[in-house]
């Protein structure tokens, strides 16, 4: 039986490693983890997200995922707004869906350096 989620992979073009580290590591604050030796030559980068992982993998014929996306849970509404400000300060567009769509949840959408959609989510009391 399934007991959890191990990792999510997003695709990126060849040569993506430094941009992956700058975006997912520095900007979003994820911890980079070492790829297994047999996989390191394929490029990309891996990051820890609590007890799960985000894998940025090199894809031949890359095209961004504009609908499918990872959704990262953040600790608070204040953290969500801080990350929104950081994304915007670095030139990334941020959109904020209506809280009415999922009551009790604040969300924002943005894109990584290659146009893959990402979502950031914070739980809040309904109506705030």
Label each region the model flagged.
Residues 32-34, 55-56, 92-97:
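A short linear hydrophobic-aromatic micro-motif
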Residues 22, 26, 83-88:
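Short amphipathic alpha-helices in soluble, non-transmembrane regions
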Residues 39-43, 64, 101-106:
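Short acidic/glycine-enriched loop/turn segments that link adjacent beta-strands
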Residues 16-19, 78-83:
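Short, conserved charged micro-motifs
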Residues 11-53:
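Core segments of cupin and vicinal oxygen chelate
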Residues 7-9, 46, 69-71, 107-109:
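Short aromatic/hydrophobic contact patches that present stacked aromatics
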